Regions:
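Catalytic zinc-binding patch centered on the HExxH motif and its immediate surroundings
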Residues: 113-132
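Post-HEXXH active-site segment of zinc metalloproteases
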Residues: 166-190
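Bacterial N-terminal signal peptides
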Residues: 10-17
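Bacterial N-terminal signal peptides that target proteins for export
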Residues: 1-10
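N-terminal signal peptide c-region/cleavage motif recognized by signal peptidases
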Residues: 19-22
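C-terminal capping/extension segments of zinc metalloprotease domains
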Residues: 24-89, 95, 106-113, 121, ...
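Short alpha-helix carrying the canonical HExxH Zn2+-binding catalytic motif
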Residues: 146-162
């Protein structure tokens, strides 16, 4: 296992959420990504069949002999950052969140691959670090009205594990450019590739939710709500929100978008506990 290809994105995301807003016009410097090719590639009239293919492509990191050593290393590195104080060390809250997201993890045999870290912050963020750490903010859960929305974020993060090699190559290109190597053209192509991967992870999430009998549309609406309520918080190399929603809604059968969203007892208890913490 190599150092996380998501580490630069992880640092940028957490810095953005925990330290200061990035005030930039939405879309002013957003990489252009053709949405239709992504929709054409990922559209499935049989989501369950598509998921079976992905199940064969998804590596099980916990099966690696060095898994525990690597996970410990990644956790120790994370604990040295300025973000560690925001960790919500509450076993009950962590256990309830684990119960909510478990269906997506089990589907891809990832239930024993992640150390779940709950970050206490109001900005909704989910992040997969190296396939061994999974971080979700309390804000993500607090905004959710159904398990489907939370599972949509988690499935998106699982999708990154399929594309980690492409992500690593694109990130390497950007790092070289920042050091004065490479060309503007290569830099732009790398940014476009990262934005395309994000759309593909949205498609992965949508098809996965449909295969689970969940409503992918709730995930898309969630993204639009976050964009509306947090207009000053933007990330590099992310496609526009309306493009993300178009992908989410068009890669699955229309019937999937009318599925009734579910709210489990675990999510209800989790949201209640978080509400109590906010009142303290």
């Amino acid at each position: 296992m190599n150092t996380s290809p998501f580490k630069p994105l992880l640092i940028a995301t957490l810095t953005l959420c925990l330290l200061a807003p990035a005030r930039a016009e939405k879309g002013a410097d957003t990489p252009e990504v053709a949405v239709e090719p992504v929709i054409a590639e990922y559209h499935s009239d049989d989501p369950a069949a598509r998921v079976r293919v992905w199940q064969t492509q998804m590596t099980r990191t916990s099966g690696n002999p060095k898994f525990h050593e690597f996970q410990k290393q990644r956790l120790e590195e994370w604990q040295k950052t300025e973000f560690a104080p925001h960790l919500l060390d509450d076993p009950q809250i962590t256990a309830l969140l684990a119960e909510v997201i478990r269906p997506a993890l089990v589907l891809y045999r990832r239930q024993d691959c992640f150390k779940l870290l709950v970050i206490e912050h109001h900005i909704p963020v989910a992040m997969n670090d190296s396939g061994v750490l999974l971080m979700l903010t309390t804000g993500l859960v607090e905004r959710a009205t159904s398990d489907d929305e939370v599972l949509g974020h988690v499935a998106h993060e699982l999708g990154h594990d399929i594309h980690w090699r492409r992500t690593a190559r694109a990130r390497q290109t950007l790092e070289l450019y920042e050091r004065g190597a490479g060309t503007v053209l290569l830099m732009r192509r790398a940014r476009e590739e990262l934005a395309k991967i994000e759309l593909e992870c949205d498609a992965f999430s949508s098809v996965t939710l449909a295969a689970m009998g969940r409503n992918p549309g709730t995930f898309g609406k969630y993204l639009l709500g976050v964009a509306r309520d947090f207009p000053d918080y933007t990330l590099e190399n992310m496609p526009l929100d309306d493009a993300r929603v178009r992908v989410i809604e068009r890669v699955v059968p229309a019937a999937a978008l009318s599925t009734r969203p579910e709210q489990s007892e675990a999510l209800k208890k989790l949201k209640a506990l978080l509400e109590v913490r906010k009142r303290r």
